[in-house]
Amino acid sequence: GGISVPGPMGPSGPRGLPGPPGPGPQGFQGPPGEPGEPGSSGPMGPRGPPGPPGKNGDDGEAGKPGRPGERGPPGPQGARGLPGTAGLPGMKGHRGFSGLDGAKGDAGPAGPKGEPGSPGENGAPGQMGPRGPGERGRPGASGPAGARGNDGATGAAGPPGPTGPAGPPGFPGAVGAKGEAGPQGARGSEGPQGVRGEPGPPGPAGAAGPAGNPGADGQPGAKGANGAPGIAGAPGFPGARGPSGPQGPSGPPGPKGNSGEPGAPGGEPGPTGIQGPPGPAGEEGKRGARGEPGPTGLPGPPGERGGPGSRGFPGADGVAGPKGSPGEAGRPGEAGLPGAKGLTGSPGSPGPDGKTGPPGPAGQDGRPGPPGPPGARGQAGVMGFPGPKGAAGEPGKAGERGVPGPPGAVGPAGKDGEAGAQGPPGPAGPAGERGEQGPAGPGFQGLPGPAGPPGEAGKPGEQGVPGDLGAPGPSGARGERGFPGERGVQGPPGPAGPRGSSQGAPGLQGMPGERGAAGLPGPKGDRGDAGPKGADGAPGKDGVRGLTGPIGPPGPAGAPGDKGESGPSGPAGPTGARGAPGDRGEPGPPGPAGFAGPPGADGQPGAKGEPGDAGAKGDAGPPGPAGPTGAPGPIGNLGAPGPKGARGSAGPPGATGFPGAAGRVGPPGPSGNAGPPGPPGPVGKEGGKGPRGETGPAGEVGPPGPPGPSGEKGSPGADGPAGAPGTPGPQGISGQRGVVGLPGQRGERGFPGLPGPSGEPGKQGPSGSSGERGPPGPMGPPGLAGPPGESGREGPGAEGSPGRDGSPGPKGDRGEGPPGAPGAPGAPGPVGPAGKSGDRGETGPGPAGPAGPAGARGPAGPQGPRGDKGETGEQGDRGIKGHRGFSGLQGPAGPPGSPGEQGPSGASGPAGPRGPPGSAGSPGKDGLNGLPGPIGPPGPRGRTGDAGPVGPPGPPGPPGPPGPP
């Protein structure tokens, strides 16, 4: 056969249907196969088209307001506002200038001057024997001058004398020591921080207008831009009032205001006590003959202290006329009318009583000579230089607190201005209305009470309005889809970001990213309303003292202060001019009886005689025997007064007379109105003690010359020696009482002297921190005149030399007549040194010795101890609450946050739970402080501290002249 060649395989047939299960049992399941290797991932399919944008989710519910976060730490304190300037205290009404002494009136015509004999040494009093019929003995030789009697007791101050005419203002006084500040008051609760204002330029110090009487308060000036004082703390307790601070430069002094009434001391001398009966006559002593009128006595005690005048050069004495013929001495005529009353000087400390010497036998009067023609009146001399400065006195003790004065006028409140750029602070506005002060109760000011309990805490302020949204940030680039991250911890919600505008198509939902950092804090909201005022905190540290603002207008005059006790006596002033004759005193005891004579007819006034030339000193004659006592004669009629005689040459000074009796105590005078303040004056230098002059020998009286015509006034001649005593003439008949002469012309006023420096201040309480004094503001209009203050104590300024008295009128002739009643005692002289208290002699009127020379001015007494510190004044009223500052301006919006990068779109997760409220953002910058509130009114003035103890008495002044016979 043939070879079979296989053909190609045919196609396989269709798969057969499964056969029926075999009859055999089912096999066991085989072990699991090993896992196959994972297949490699297929290629990524193409990215599907983006799905439609999802709908914006509904706005979530507004979160409930979170609990207010804990109060953050206080923000940095803004610059401390300058301390509110306390309402300037009303300028103290400066004590009016002491009214300069009015021009001293010319002394009234002196009553006929008794002829002073040289006092003999005091002998033991003898019994007055009956006057025998023997002839009159010749005058004995002048005995040596008696020892100076101890100073008499100082008369108590009489009622004030009439107010002298206002003098020109004094020169500036010395700058007083700067008063120490009172204790620091507790700091009030701090108000909103004020914008610190630049200190305004000080206003130029205007020239002070004329002071005059204080006018009504002027209209308050327009309120300047408020500076930046913080709210003033509650006023501290006023410290003890310090001495006046240094006076700022003041304009030229205005014209003098009304002169205040002179305070005590001063006043007319009290009536002379009734002279006791004459003591028994002593044994015949060294009593000289009664000579012609001796030299003029020393000037009377100084008048009320005026402004020190310049010491005048003495005017030239007139040329002596020819010697008059000797006349017989008559009995002293009645005292002339009193001249213009001099202002009373300060009383000195009483000296101890001196021994009273026994009276010598009285000489008999001679017949009066014929009167000469009146002489021409001399011209006033040039003013002298001021005297040395006296020692500083101690401060007087403070009196009780006075009733507070009426409240000042209410100033208009300023309008609330908008906060502008920082400008210079304007002048302080007028003080607000002050409540009336209740009357002061009796007793002294108590100590300040303990601090009160703290007040309630203020409620928290309301939440401020949120600031504006920031500008939207730019949209970020779309990121790739990331793998889902782990769910982060829920962080605090950040602040809402700005709402974007015109965002592009949303990216795919990214997986939640990690919580971003907290956003920047939003701007600070407006300040909430202030809570209730908390309790006053403890006093804070004293801030830096701000510049003192310009001085505001003076406030109304304060209530009068309590009258202080009299300070220590100042140094003795220079010898004042001779006082006018005093009022007629009580009638003295009857003198020794004279021979009875017929009543004389009224004599015609004789022509005035010129003063005689001084005779040569004669030898002293032996003492004559005592003359017999004559029977009392009738009192003659009053004779007509003769014309004034020419001024005689001055004789040597006589010895010091006995002290005058103490004057009666007068009621205190009314307080004077406070005058405008005077500028400070220069401090004078204290002069040294001058040598004490020796007492010259008593001259003997020469016979009077015949009357001559009055000559022209020439240059002053030297004092001639006293003439020898002439032989006594026979007893003249008692003439009629002369008519009282008219008072002389008033002398010219001296120039005002410089005021003395102010005394040292008393101790002051602890001082608060004080800043530098700012320049003084212009002087405001004068305030209304307050009630008159009590007279303060007199400062211890140096007393200037008195202005030169006008030339005295020509001396009248001695008129005949019965002995005049004793005149009132002269005003007490300055305090002399305390002499040793001698044994008290028997009382009896001693003979008036001739006036001695003025003693040298004693040195200034030692300064008294410093006064105790005054008590703390009562707490001032709390100032009204300052105006709340305006809400600060809203701070600027914070910068927009940097945009975050777009995260990959993730599947939208479920809404998470609402997060807790976020922590409070850090506080924004403080807004600008509002304008400060007005300054509260000043508290009431503290009471003046008690005065220190009285210093030791000053040095002795020159002795006063002897009283009238």
UniProtKB/Swiss-Prot annotation:
Composition bias (Low complexity) maps to: 26-44, 106-122, 139-157, 205-244, 341-367, 376-395, 454-463, 566-580, 593-620, 649-665, 710-725, 851-865, 899-932
Name one matching Pfam family: Collagen
| GO cellular component term of the entry, any | extracellular space
Q: Which UniProt keywords apply?
A: Extinct organism protein, Extracellular matrix, Glycoprotein, Hydroxylation, Phosphoprotein, Secreted
Bilayer-crossing residues are: none
Let me know which tissues express this protein, per UniProt: Expressed in bones.
Q: Residue spans with biased composition (Pro residues)?
A: 159-171, 775-785, 819-831, 950-965
Q: Using the record's annotations, give every residue carrying the modification 5-hydroxylysine.
A: K92, K256, K323, K533, K644, K811, K869, K881
Q: Bias category Basic and acidic residues: which stretches?
A: 56-70, 866-880
Which residue ranges are recorded for the region named Disordered? 1-965
Q: List the disulfide bonds.
A: none
Residue ranges annotated as compositionally biased, kind Gly residues, are 303-312
Further comment: These protein fragments were extracted from an ancient mandible bone collected in Haiti.
Q: How does this polypeptide assemble, per the annotation?
A: Trimers of one alpha 2(I) and two alpha 1(I) chains.
Its protein name is: Collagen alpha-1(I) chain
**Which lineage is the organism of this entry classified under, starting from the top rank?**
Eukaryota, Metazoa, Chordata, Craniata, Vertebrata
